[in-house]
C-alpha cells in the first residue's frame, strides 16, 4: 500500500513541530518498521533538517527501517544509496519486523509508519512458535504492579503489533524521549 505525500508530511509535522524549539545540536534517529520505499523516512529527514536549520542548529539524522517486500526493499535501499553516502542504506533491513526484528536492540528518537492493515500475520505467528506461545516482550504491556500482559491480536490483522514494536523502541531516559506517528485504519 502507499501513503499519500500530504499524509506523510502531516505525520512529520505531528512528530517534529511540538518539539521544534527543543531541538539541540545533536544526532537523532528515525525508524519505520514497515518502510516500503522509504518515503516516510526521507520526508522525516528533510523536515527535521529544515526545522533545525531555521533554528540555527546543526543536526544529523540517521534513518533505520525494515521491509518485508523484496521489490520495495530494493527501491528503498537504492534510494538511500542515491541520496546519501550509503550509510543510511546499511540501516534498511530486509525481512519481517514482526518475526525477525533486525533492529531489536535499538531505540529511536522518532518513528513514523503506515503498517499494513487487514493483512494476516499468521506466518509470522507460526515462526514465533504459534500465537499462544509468543514470548516476545515487544508485544506486552505492563500493568501498574509490573505484571506483563500480552497484547497479541487476532492473526487476521497485525497492525497493532507494529505499534507495540514502536512503543518498545521508545527512548525512556532522554529529555525529548521518543515520538511516534503511525497511521491505522481505525
Predicted ranges, named:
Residues 1, 112-113, 147-150:
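Compositionally biased, intrinsically disordered/low-complexity regions enriched for serine, proline
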Residues 110, 132-135, 155:
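Short linear sequence motifs
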Residues 73, 77, 145-186:
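Conserved Class I SAM-dependent methyltransferase catalytic core
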Residues 122-148:
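A mobile, often basic/glycine-rich helix-loop segment
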Residues 3-113, 118-129, 184-186:
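Conserved S-adenosyl-L-methionine
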Residues 96, 115, 119, 137, ...:
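Flexible, active-site-adjacent loop/turn segments at secondary-structure boundaries
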